[in-house]
Amino acid sequence: MIPPRIVPWRDFAELEELKLWFYPKSKGTIEDKRQRAVQRVQSYRLKGSQYLPHVVDSTAQITCAVLLDEKEACLGVHQDSIPIRLSYVMALIRFVNGLLDPTQQSQFAIPLHTLAAKIGLPSWFVDLRHWGTHERDLPGLEMLRWAANEALSWLYDHYWNDEELEDDRDDDDDDDDTGYGYRRNDKLEKYMESLTKTLDKWKRLRNEFLEYKWVWENANDSLITSSNFSGDNLVNYDAEKRKSSHASSSETMIRENLRQWQELWKLSIYHNVVLEKFFNNYDPLLLKVLMLNLNNFDWKVIEWVARNYRTQQDDSNITTILKRKFNAWKELQKRLLDVIINNLNNKNFKNKWQNWEKLIDENASYLILYFCQSMLAKLETEKITGNSWRNKKRRKQIDSTVEIEAKLKENIDNLSLRFNEGEIKLYDFIPAEKDSVPLKKEVSPALKADTNDILGDLASLKQRMSSFGTVGKKNKQEENRATPVKNWSRVQNWKPKPFGVL
């Protein structure tokens, strides 16, 4: 359950009003309320800056820079004035830093381009931030105006017009028929439609995903320096565009498809919908793509698999999606579990150990036992094959790997006492039916009688074996008591002889 959060606005209606002030529905609005929106955000800040979300504050700061630019333009001041450029640069730098700094939670610094790719922020914002911070000359005014407009558009798409806000508002106004938004069933239908289109597009682009792996395997985008914004390379732009038009178009389509997956995954209430759709159309390549590009997809998919596996093991009359796609344990192990484990990032596994530990505790099974054993072996292999200078550095620091390995070993010991390879035979024994819930077959009385006879014979045989074992133990104990215990003594007049000679 998500804990409640203190916000400076009274209700969602007030936030909706602020949104309309920042982003009027029509540009020809008679009364421009952007200045009033900036003032309202300033009043929110007086209530406590810790309660004000960064995206709201950043929207106000960028809008303030835009208003200052428009004001000086109306007064006829020189267009390339330093105060306006500094105002734009500072607002954009704070915009980027406020988005990326909270995601910098690793033990070692992660490149900002990687963090930007995870949240869907275009990489050129990172380069513009670097240019405004470290370069000798500030970016041009036209470039800054365009960047501010793009930043406001990004904030609108990822926050102000986010469906999660609509979900929260609809929860409060569930019985309201005023025409705002659409009901949850309609949302699910539209979500499923978008999910189906995204999946179909991925199927069409599968060959491109195989050919241009570097686009989705490496989150780092190519750096853009200040020369990219100066216009010096525009002379050869058409030639370069014709030369690599196919590659650039494929790269664009791949990035667009990844962005669609990320937008769908942002709504946590539909995670199970995405996972069910994914497993109904299972592809190892798509699994790798989503694990590398969707936040928390790795442990979410393991959690879904573990729950499906336990449901299948607990009730043999139910055929889960997992059983229909992977009928035998070896198939499940090679085509799914090993793919997940091989593509699981060890650093992410350590950083999010709390999530993994909770998953292991709540979904105990032989599948989780296999997962723990494989991850322990993977972590130990990484420790052996790591670079020497990294190992020296790790010795000086408190490394959480030792603690995680100890907990994994403890979980393995506990799970080994409860589960064994007999679960594999049970999983293989259950047939994969087409129907999700097959009908129970009635057993004939004759078959019941035969079964009871067999079970009775087995019980009597077990009793005889146990009684025979107790008798054998008693006989051995009596023999041991009958034979006296003698101490070792040296043999007198012993002469060594060759083997075979008496």
UniProtKB/Swiss-Prot annotation:
Residue ranges of coiled coil: none
Keyword Nucleus among record annotations: yes
GO biological process assignments: cleavage in ITS2 between 5.8S rRNA and LSU-rRNA of tricistronic rRNA transcript (SSU-rRNA, 5.8S rRNA, LSU-rRNA); maturation of 5.8S rRNA; maturation of LSU-rRNA
Presence of keyword Disulfide bond: no
Keyword terms: Mitochondrion, Nucleus
GO cellular component labels: cytoplasm; Las1 complex; mitochondrion; nucleolus; nucleus; preribosome, large subunit precursor
GO MF terms, alphabetically ordered: endonuclease activity
Region Disordered: start-end pairs: 469-489
Subcellular location: Nucleus; Mitochondrion
Other notes: Present with 647 molecules/cell in log phase SD medium.
PANTHER family recorded: RIBOSOMAL BIOGENESIS PROTEIN LAS1L
Function noted in UniProt: Regulates cell surface growth, bud formation and morphogenesis. May act indirectly by regulating factor(s) involved in these processes.
Membership in a protein family: Belongs to the LAS1 family.
Name of the featured protein: Protein LAS1
Organism: Saccharomyces cerevisiae (strain ATCC 204508 / S288c) (Baker's yeast)
Organism ancestry: Eukaryota, Fungi, Dikarya, Ascomycota, Saccharomycotina
Gene name for this UniProt entry: LAS1
